[in-house]
Amino acid sequence: MGAAAEPGAGSTAAEWPKVVAAFANPPAEFRLIQYGTHDGAALPMARMAEAGIGGVMLFMQSHGYLRSDDAWRNLEANIRAARTAGLQVWVGDDTGYPSGMAGGLVVEEHPEAESRCLVAVCREGTGPGPAHLDLPATAERFVHACIYPLVDGRPAFDRGRPATVSGQRIESEGLEGPWRLCGFALQLNREGTQASMTISGFGHNGRYPNLLDATAMATFTGLTHEAYARRLGSLADTIDVFYTNEPNLMTSWFLPGARPGGVVFVPWHEDLPRRFQAEHGYDLLPVLPALFGGDDAVSRLARRHFYETVGTLLAENFPRRITEWGKGQGVRSAGHPLLEESMVHHVAGYGDFFRFVSELDIPACDLPMPDRGQAWNFWMPRFLSSVAQARGRATVAALLDPIINRPVAQLVPPPADVRRFTGMAALCGVNQFATYILWHQYDPAVYRGVNEYVGRLSAVLRGATSAATVAVYYPIESFQAAFVPSASTLQGEAWERVAERGSRQDTMAQALLTHGIDFTWLHGDWIRDGRVEQGHLVAAGGRYSVIVMPEVDVLPLPVARKLAEFEAGGGRILWMATLPTMGDFPDENAAVREMFAGRSVVAPGDVIPALGKVAPPGFAVAVDDLQPGVFMAKFVRDGRRITFLVNDGLEPARATVRTTAGEGLTADVFDPLAGTVTPVQVPGILSVEPCSSLLIVER
């Protein structure tokens, strides 16, 4: 994963007048993308434009998906109408979700590419003698078998020996002492999947392809993206964005209870052993039992390396394929993964979530709209915006979703609620919003006002770079090592352990933003490839003086060395809850432990006092003592420093603004609710309306 330039690099003050003009009257590219329907019906584009909508998300008709000439004609008519109305055109790359199946046509064409997962079947015994295992009735074939001596109840991987696979039976000879015979088989993955949950909603067959399979993914793009090019001709002026919706490895169980027989699925492709060997230097097959459990160091590292290999292969095969194809057509790629908020699912669904998202032109997320007082992970979009900044992507998108994380859907939310959720998401880096709230049930002037508010925020903040000087390590290695799959989603001791770790991490992230401390996530690769300069780490489009390490127990040695260099150069490292105990290979462990031995460790609840006062340098405007419900982030764009204030409360909030320059100054306050730009004297007091925001722009 490459990194972008430093904050503000390439920006010019000459661009700022364009920003001011866009704020006054936001062009369509900054306004809401409105979801269409899945029946192919003609959309009232002129009315939508009158309501201030900036674009449409079009879907090919579900009935007869991709095979109906009438559906193609309807889609073309909607595209022409949208272009005539001056709207953006985004197109969903599948019928509903999860993307990747082309409405089930991929598996129809290539049944061999349907998702098949690895399952384990084992038996234990003691002493010599014949031993065998039979293929489970639900599995198709064995792919590997091995017998291991047990030491303290654990398989000794380095002393295991292959067992003979003969058709549907594994045969072996028992070992001296206790042993475990393990067979690993492929099982078709259809029941209880996310894909099976959407059959009735979108009319597909529920048969999901293996996203690790190159043939499957070439077939997917051939049936979908390439079909649009064949039908519509040049796409550069026809479709702006292809949007992918929750493609994933599909190993999790989505029904109540557990998978029949308690069977546990692990993602698999025949190329994984070769890739694993090439990337990590040892054989995957002898350590296959570790993918299903084990807390010893060998098992944890095997899982770490396995899911990293899976993540690399998945990123190449799905999002990179789509993005590279789009470059040749002049169409950008976008999309939101499944359960973006959960570090557990960053592993379960993607191997390495950041690797997957990094390949998209426009990283995106699903944005819940819960009632006040309900759980709300408002900080979650920072995952996506951190990737965007690292990759130099200007646009970060979010779907305002009025259904998820709610007891009852709210398809016509009050405008203040829409402002509330867009403001908090913009605080965390989102600058393009889509939704399927029922726009036609609003007065056109009211909905136009919603679009203008959203458009003004996006007009100023798209292309801006976070000025955060606090980074939080993205501890994917530790989650990969700890993750053990389960027959029941989010159940079982191992899942609970990693989920609790993720919850503590979320609490820390929430506390940072609540106390006015913005931050950026840093993947280990970005730290490794960064440079240390005057007490700062310059990496992934940012410049950081503090790095928070949240329960990091696995730390690759090259990353550890860069962190040690950063610390020696005057940077601060805050270790939350634990110090690293492992490197990325056994011969790294001692060096990693010694490098940070004796460092202080803070509890999750003590991160804020341990940080103390943290503020990005170079800003002449400061806001102290934020009222409860008021949040702050700082950005840099086109040579301008921007202090962004969001009032999440129901009452007007006062913000005391001072100058760090030692004398008064004049700043411009951009009010996205009123649509005004007002010069103000600093120091002074500003009032932020409920569920609204202000952007204080230094001259």
Task: Spell out what each predicted region is.
Residues L58-G174, P178-A218:
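Acidic/aromatic-lined carbohydrate-recognition and catalytic surfaces
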Residues G8, T12-E15, A28-Y35, A42-L43, ...:
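Carbohydrate-binding surfaces of carbohydrate-active enzymes
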Residues M1-G2:
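N-terminal export leaders
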Residues K18-P26:
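N-terminal amphipathic alpha-helix/helix-capping segment at the start of soluble metabolic enzymes
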Residues M48-A49, G55:
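An N-terminally biased module of ancient metal coordination in phosphate/nucleic-acid-related enzymes
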Residues W179-A195, F202-R230, Q410, T469-A482, ...:
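Catalytic grooves of carbohydrate-active enzymes
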Residues A22, P44-M45:
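Short secondary-structure capping/turn segments at boundaries of alpha-helices and beta-strands
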